[in-house]
UniProtKB/Swiss-Prot annotation:
Required cofactor(s): FAD
Glycosylated position list: N126, N147, N157
Binding site for FAD: D59, G73
UniProt keyword terms in alphabetical order: FAD, Flavoprotein, Glycoprotein, Monooxygenase, Oxidoreductase, Signal
Enzyme class: oxidoreductase
Protein family per UniProt: Belongs to the paxM FAD-dependent monooxygenase family.
Protein name listed in UniProt: FAD-dependent monooxygenase elcH
Signal peptide positions on this chain: 1-19
Length: 485
């Protein structure tokens, strides 16, 4: 039993859905990419040349290739992910220029096993056929990612200020307004504007507890030391620039690294703290006294506290991360990269996750020809990427805990550390990115099939109701009367 009012509502709903589907099927889908940086540029590379898509790329920066990183450090999975984007992306590292970071020697920094080598990465079998860390200059790499995207589609100096979600009957479901007053209509928005940007709150809501980054309870001091000074303070064993290695000292609650990099010995010291750090402060002041207290537990021969006290500018950087997000999508708006899962320096695996996000989104959106396809693509993206990126986040965090001797039943025992680090390496390399990509495609196809089946049922029902249009017209004035179908 239906009232004429309910039938009319159903008819309007069906007409709206049909109009919406037709409006997106009859034209290119407008894909807005916002934020700039590694994930955004890689997604632009993945989508370029797709005849079904009109890609528009917006970067808040004046330069389309800016980054807060002086260098990118890519783990082996980055090479695999880029190869799955397309052939051009697969060769981008070679064309950009790169060099391998010196392989690590992990050493116990204190206690009865002090100076015992835990793991020498150079002695391990390279099962990935890529360096432990590939170092790339961000600017030429991002240029490679944006290469081939028409300049008319690239929009620097565009800061997003609002997103208006339109009625389903609208030609475009999204209206993006920028700080300069310009407006872009779009079918879907994919954004990565960093851990403190707007995209995360657009997806989760401004008041969601997982919206803002959180302090990981580690602070780090960074020092760039002239090689001669580093050699005097660290000694020949650790400070000799000709060794071609980087050294990591594991302490109880502290960790110290030194490596010869671009003409300087770069030294990094991190320590655990339970202080209530104010994340509105991007750095905080430290003192010789504090650094000495934090790092004097390490072998005195290292002189790590003297290096950090004398060359760090007495500034500490908080290690921050995102709490797990319950979703990466909200309607036709999705977040990726550092907006979705910012990871600390300890985790080291953030760049690979940014590129994996773009690889999956690019694969899915390339095959989208309607708004319904886009919705299915975003659903598949969220389904596969959230568990994967969160696993990587926790996996990388475990490495940080191992570095600082804070894993229960491992501590700073050299044999236990070696076993745990080898297991960490094995787990990192075991993930199959091709299978990950195929699973995303499978989920998208299945979602489209299920939703199109439901749509056909509604369409048939509407056809039946359409036959009674004359009856509706005859009984317009009796809107409260029941009509039995």
């Amino acid at each position: 039993m239906f009232t004429l009012r309910s039938l009319a509502i159903l008819a309007v709903f069906a007409a709206t859905a049909l109009a919406s589907k037709q409006s997106s099927n009859d034209r290119e889908l407008v894909v807005a990419i916002y934020g700039g940086g590694l994930a955004s540029a890689t997604l632009a590379q993945a989508l370029k040349g797709s005849s079904n898509l009109n890609v528009q790329y917006f970067d808040p920066a004046l330069d389309l290739t800016p980054t807060s990183f002086r260098l990118f450090g890519f783990d082996p999975k980055v090479h695999d992910a880029l190869a799955l984007v397309n052939e051009e992306a697969g060769g981008a590292i070679e064309r950009s220029g790169w060099y391998p970071e010196e392989p690590s020697v992990v050493v116990v920094g204190q206690g009865s096993d002090a100076d015992t080598v835990v793991l020498d990465w150079a002695q391990l079998k390279n099962t990935t056929h890529h360096p432990q860390v590939t170092v790339v200059d961000p600017k030429p790499f991002l240029q490679q990612m944006l290469n081939g995207t028409d300049e008319s589609r690239l929009h620097p100096n565009k800061t997003l200020v609002s997103i208006t979600r339109k009625d389903l009957s609208a030609k475009y479901p999204l209206e993006l307004k920028f700080q300069d007053g310009s407006i872009q209509h779009a079918d879907v928005l994919i954004g990565d504007d960093g851990p403190f940007g707007q995209m995360r709150s657009e997806v989760l809501g401004a008041k969601h507890p997982a919206n803002a980054p959180v302090f990981m309870n580690f602070l780090s001091a960074v020092a760039h030391v002239a090689p001669d000074d580093a050699e005097k303070l660290l000694g020949q064993k650790y400070g000799n620039r000709d060794l071609g290695r980087r050294f990591e000292r594991v302490g109880m609650g502290s960790w110290f690294l030194n490596a010869y990099l671009e003409g300087f010995s770069t030294c990094l010291g991190s320590f655990y703290t339970e202080e209530a750090y104010d994340l509105s402060q991007f750095t905080r002041t430290t003192s010789v006294k504090e650094l000495t207290a934090r790092f004097s537990n390490l072998n005195e021969a290292d002189n790590s506290q003297k290096i950090l006290s004398g060359y760090s500018g007495l500034r500490l950087i908080p290690e921050i991360e995102h709490s797990p997000a319950p979703t990466y999508i909200n309607g036709l708006v999705a977040m990726q990269g550092n907006a979705a899962h910012f990871m600390t320096n300890f985790q080291q695996l953030g760049p690979s996750q940014q590129i994996e996000d773009a690889m999956i989104l690019g694969t899915l959106l390339r095959s989208a020809h309607s708004r319904a396809d886009v919705e299915a693509a975003l659903y598949a993206y969220d389904t596969v990427r959230r568990p994967r990126s969160q696993w990587v986040s926790e996996h990388g965090k475990r490495l940080g805990w191992l570095w600082t001797g804070m894993v229960e039943d491992v501590g700073i025992d050299a044999k236990k550390l070696k076993k745990a680090m080898l297991q960490w390496k094995q787990d990192s390399e075991a993930f199959d990115l091709k299978a990950h990509k195929n699973e995303a495609v499978k989920i998208m196809k299945q979602t489209i099939k299920e939703r199109s089946g439901s749509e056909k049922i509604i369409t048939q029902e509407e056809k039946i109701k359409a036959g009674f249009q004359g009856l509706w017209e005859a009984m317009r004035e009796k809107s409260g009367e029941q009509v039995e179908l």
